[in-house]
A protein has these predicted regions:
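Binuclear metal-ion centers of metallo-dependent hydrolases, dominated by the metallo-beta-lactamase
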Residues: 2-14, 100-155
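Catalytic metal-binding/acid-base residues of hydrolase active sites
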Residues: 51, 91-95, 120-122
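Core dinuclear metal-dependent hydrolase active-site scaffold
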Residues: 4-84, 149-155
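Structural recognition of the beta-strand scaffold that forms the well-ordered cores
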Residues: 45-46, 86-90, 116-118
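Metal-dependent phosphoesterases centered on the DNase I-like endonuclease/exonuclease/phosphatase
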Residues: 79-84, 89, 107-109
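A short, acidic, amphipathic alpha-helical segment used as a generic capping/interface helix at domain edges
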Residues: 72-78, 97-106
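Conserved protein kinase catalytic core
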Residues: 55, 97, 126
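Active-site glycine- and acidic-residue-rich loops that bind
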Residues: 27, 95-98
Length: 155
């Protein structure tokens, strides 16, 4: 039986079943983001609602600057502790208009990612899938899931 534990940014749960370790990082919105490390050292990052949440097309210059500064501060912390992440799930939210992929692009510039999964795109699979065509991260494999429950086997 596994007990449930609430986590705050900075918390680390170690020695979980199967040798799993979980670290929580701050978010720019609700909750936290998580880095899971498996017993074999594989790292899996789930951003939750961590993103560069500003709408360049709608935000004031000040709102955009504040959102960008907070995002970069948290991203720098994550990057300082993780130069490479094997699997990352990160928001690519088309509601943000022209900036819908900004946070993901900055994340991929700061941290080497082997396999990237866009999320938080509200069913707009085309936009999420198009992201991989212009992301500047040649060492990253981009995976697009086209329906809920779809799986991908990684090697």
């Amino acid at each position: 039986t596994l007990s449930v534990a609430g986590m705050s940014a900075g918390d680390i749960l170690e020695n979980l079943p199967g040798g799993i370790k979980v670290k929580a990082y701050k978010s720019t919105d609700e909750g936290v983001s998580f880095l899971v490390t498996t017993a074999d050292g594989t790292t899996i990052y789930h951003a939750g609602d961590f993103n560069d949440w500003h709408w360049q097309d709608e935000s004031t210059e000040r709102e955009a600057r504040v959102a960008d500064e907070l995002f970069k501060k948290i991203l720098n912390r994550i990057a300082s502790e993780n130069d490479r992440i094997n699997i990352a799930m990160f928001p690519v939210d088309v509601r943000q208009g022209s900036d819908f992929a900004r946070g993901a692009k900055l994340f991929l510039k700061a941290i080497k990612v082997d396999d990237f999964f866009p999320m938080h795109f509200g069913g707009d699979y085309k936009e999420a899938c198009d992201f991989s065509e212009y992301a500047e991260s040649p060492e990253t494999t981009f995976h697009c899931l086209h329906k809920p429950g779809e799986t991908v086997e990684l090697r």
